[in-house]
Amino acid sequence: MEARLDAVADAFEAGDFEAALAGAEGLLADAPELPEALHFRASALVELGRLEEAGKAFGQALKVAPEDLEILLSAADCLVCRAGEDREAVAEGLALCARGRRLAQKADDVEMLYEFLLLEGMGLNQMGECATALVSLDAALGHMPRSLDAQVERGIALFELCRFDEAKAAFEKVLKDAPDDPWAHHYLGLIAERRGDEKEAKRRFDKARALVPEEFPPPVELAEAEFDRAVEDAVKSLPRHAKQYLDNVTIAVEDLPSDEDLLGQDPPLSPSILGVFRGTPVGERSVMNAYELPASIVLYQRNLERFARTREELIEQIGITVMHEVGHLMGLDEDDLWQRGLD
């Protein structure tokens, strides 16, 4: 049995995930509750992109070995890092992180505690809970002070919280130890862009793109008139029940969100937001309140162009963003919009 497990491990390490899966399933035919084989099976399914099957496989593994730190970490990583924009999956992964963190503390396993704290910080950043993410990431760095992964993720949290000077210092610190870290260059480009340093922003973006072109494709750029036309088409395509709310609502396009827009809420809005609704939702307005500002919707062209990978995707996202902000105008919150697929 040990030799067969070693063969599965060798296949997995060599990147032959089909062979690793076949070997793990062969082991499970003889020993259905062998934790190591269950773990290899689930992990191989992840690497093969069969995520739904992987989720079930991790469930089986955790049923057999509910306190196995390695299985818990792999299952949490699958949910946090591989599930894309699935907030429910990320939330489930965060629950596994909390469980693993407690078990690692109990076992005095510093390395695994660090891993769970780092993954927790990543998941919290994805959920937009960046202040809480900072707590986890600072704790992770308390155990592994030189961790570049934790430093980068901490810089991202600071950026999302609009603490731009601190984020800049964090990413510059990363580059001292890892001059070719693409995410540090990318975020330093975003920070330079916000302060109007176009030359520095371009240099940073070009560097990040050269390092990992698949992560940072060139933005899909539209001329001003073409972008405005796409916005007009998006408004025309709105359902009739939504259009009725747009009387006396200004729809505008700006390059990037201002500090005023971002810091007008607590916690602040993400600097990467695609659009924003300014004003009071229709259901909350009062004819007695003379101080209510006129309602407006703003789309942020550079963020939208960076978000999309093709012209078609950009046009589609403009439509989704317009509908999203009209949803806020109608009084829907982020959870309502997420349930409607408009997040």
Outline where the language-model segments fall.
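Canonical positions in the second alpha-helix
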Residues: 26-27, 60-61, 99-100, 139-140, ...
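TPR/Sel1-like alpha-solenoid repeat signature
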Residues: 11, 23, 38-45, 57, ...
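Alpha-helical segment of the N-proximal tetratricopeptide repeat
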Residues: 1-36, 40-47, 74-91, 119-126
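Active-site scaffold of zinc-dependent metalloenzymes
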Residues: 272-319, 329-343
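Structural marker of alpha-solenoid helical repeat scaffolds
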Residues: 30, 64, 103-107, 143, ...
